[in-house]
């Protein structure tokens, strides 16, 4: 596996160039294709479970609960993500949820997850500072 950014990073989609964001004050989670804002900076950390990572922001964790992508107050198996390298797109990954085996994706401005590999599931993580 290529070098992965651990720590503060942006999570940017290959297909539309949008970056994942979460704003606690507005309780707003999604993807934004415009200017870079602080609410797009995530904490990407190795979990205690080998091969899995947590994606957090504002003391919450990105979670797929089997129906929707949301933010959780508690680190649990549904907040763990593995990385699958995309060989044809160097540096890009698919983020796979540990429990539901669904890939992080987007639909319009919303973060979603699905079980079928698509072009819109390719993400790059790059250092925020």
From Swiss-Prot:
Binding site for a carbohydrate: 21-23, 26-28, 32, 37-40
Application in biotechnology: This protein has potential for the detection and control of certain cancer cells and cells of the immune system, that display asialo-GM1. Has potential clinical applications since it recognizes glycans expressed specifically by the target antigen for Guillain-Barre syndrome (GM1b), natural killer (NK) cells and basophils (asialo-GM1) and glioblastoma multiforme (SSEA-4) in vertebrates.
Entry comment describing in which tissues the protein is expressed: Highest expression in the outer part of the mantle rim. Highly expressed in gills, with a much lower expression in the digestive gland and posterior adductor muscle. Scarcely detectable in foot.
InterPro entries for the chain: Ricin_B-like_lectins (IPR035992)
Keyword Flavoprotein: no
Keyword terms: Hemagglutinin, Lectin
Function description: Galbeta1-3GalNAcbeta1-4Galbeta1-4Glc oligosaccharide-binding lectin. Binds strongly to the oligosaccharides of ganglioside GM1b and to a lesser extent its precursor asialo-GM1. Binds weakly to asialo-GM2 oligosaccharide and to the glycan moiety of globo-series stage-specific embryonal antigen 4 (SSEA-4) hexaose. Binds galactose, N-acetylgalactose and lactose. Does not bind GM1. Does not bind to Gal-beta1,3-GalNAc (Thomsen-Friedenreich antigen), the oligosaccharide of GM1a ganglioside or SSEA-4 tetraose. Does not bind to N-glycans, O-glycans or glycosaminoglycans of glycoproteins.
Subunit-structure text: Homodimer.
The protein's name in its UniProt record: GM1b/asialo-GM1 oligosaccharide-binding R-type lectin
Species in which this protein is naturally found: Mytilisepta virgata
């Amino acid at each position: 596996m290529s070098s992965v950014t651990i720590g503060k990073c942006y999570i940017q989609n290959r297909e539309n160039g949008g970056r994942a964001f979460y704003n606690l004050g507005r309780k707003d989670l999604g993807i934004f294709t415009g200017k870079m804002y602080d609410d797009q900076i995530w904490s990407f950390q190795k979990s205690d479970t080998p091969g899995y990572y947590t994606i957090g922001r504002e003391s919450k964790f990105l979670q797929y609960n089997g129906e929707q992508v949301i933010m959780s107050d508690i680190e649990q198996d549904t907040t763990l993500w593995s990385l699958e390298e995309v060989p044809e797109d160097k540096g890009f990954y698919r983020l796979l949820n540990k429990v539901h085996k669904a890939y992080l994706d987007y639909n319009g401005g919303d973060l979603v997850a699905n079980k079928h590999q698509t072009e819109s599931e390719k993400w790059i993580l790059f250092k925020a500072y």
